[in-house]
């Protein structure tokens, strides 16, 4: 959605290379490859991984210096991310993380809110998705 794109564009201004990585969640209905990547990622490097994010990052570190970028909308997101970071740092103490805050106009947008809008009325969430 537009909030994710905003964070991605900011990360691309900071880092030489950005890989969008999507974890495969076994708790969700869609299997690997069934949930298509958005068109906005067509010319950007993107990968899916199974297992722990820290393990995925370790495989990437075999070939490059890696920094995990996490997007934030508000203080609630920060609280959640800091808690998650504590777990990840126990598994990977050398983890490097950068938090990037989205622009104000995207603070209210979340994937779950868009999914809920779509359940109510197909196409209702489209206004929060990038137009290409």
Spans of features found by a protein language model:
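Nucleotidyltransferase catalytic core that binds NTPs
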Residues: 2-132
């Amino acid at each position: 959605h537009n909030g994710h794109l905003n964070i991605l564009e900011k990360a691309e201004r900071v880092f030489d290379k950005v890989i969008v990585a999507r974890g495969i969640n076994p708790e969700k209905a869609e299997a690997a490859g069934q949930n298509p990547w958005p068109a906005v990622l067509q010319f950007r490097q993107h990968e899916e991984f199974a297992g722990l994010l820290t393990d995925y990052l370790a495989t990437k570190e075999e070939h490059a210096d890696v920094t995990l970028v996490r997007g934030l909308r508000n203080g609630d997101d920060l609280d959640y991310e800091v808690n998650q970071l504590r777990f990840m740092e126990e598994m990977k103490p050398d983890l490097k993380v950068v938090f990037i805050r989205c622009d104000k106009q995207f603070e209210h947008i979340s994937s779950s809110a868009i999914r809920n809008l779509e359940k109510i009325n197909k196409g209702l969430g489209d206004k929060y998705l990038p137009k290409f």
